[in-house]
């Protein structure tokens, strides 16, 4: 899908066809939605102990993308006779690498599984499972709030009188903060438990909002966006690891699909809402930036409440199991 989308887009640039560019973007969207499942593929192929680390390492690849992508785009922007055409040509070439790499990829667990009729719980029953519901809520909140704030950041930075270059540097620092922790997030999850890591991520997101609301100087923007990146990493990777342990093998495709549909659907809404919040005070950037960060409060409250709910239910179940074993009927 990515290669086809890039090919259509490059052709659209060459022919100056906006309609063809939309077709290319459609295929690119399909590709983008599919590659989000790489983290689940790594999780499904890993052992129980290595699963959080596998998810974390896949997400860490985003660091290379964050560094290589912009540089490649700058180099290829005018590499061909028509601006942007070289960018799509490079994208086509990168996607074609998958045809070389994936034939050599073997996932051992797939060989041991036999196809069987779909059995088990309905989607609604799955969503009523405390661990699945909590994982999806925390993933949605972590990703959506990160996107909500990040989308408005360049507008707020420039609107507060700082240079566009400063806005770019702040976003770069944020992206690095999103992916650098991935090299050790999995180890932290294994050591301290997924619920604590997700909770820590939510606290860091809250800290990001507090710093942002404390002032509109450059240090505030830098610190807030770096914290936003760290909070997203712990919250989203932790929630993904939590979800991976909350369903059966037969249910994983359905659960993973529901999760990503909700997460990225809400991310889209957050992106659109971000601009509206920035404009809610008639275009005043300081008041708009405050509105964006105040909007985090109810959603963080929901995520914290879901984690507390899960903790109480888990403790109650453990206590019941202990009493049953100690005092059998």
For every predicted segment, state its role.
Residues 107-136, 325-329:
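Juxtamembrane intracellular "pre-TM" segments in multi-pass secondary transporters
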Residues 250-283:
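A late C-terminal transmembrane helix in Major Facilitator Superfamily
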Residues 75-93, 276-300:
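A membrane-interface helix-boundary motif in multi-pass transporters
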Residues 1-15, 204-216:
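C-terminal ends and interior cores of transmembrane alpha-helices
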Residues 92-113, 306-311:
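C-terminal membrane-cytosol helix-exit motif in multi-pass small-molecule transporters
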Residues 24-60:
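Cytoplasmic helix-loop-helix junction between adjacent transmembrane helices
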Residues 18-20, 48, 57-103:
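Helix-loop-helix hairpin linking two adjacent transmembrane segments in secondary transporters
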Residues 77, 181-194, 278:
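Helix-to-loop junctions at the C-terminal end of transmembrane segments
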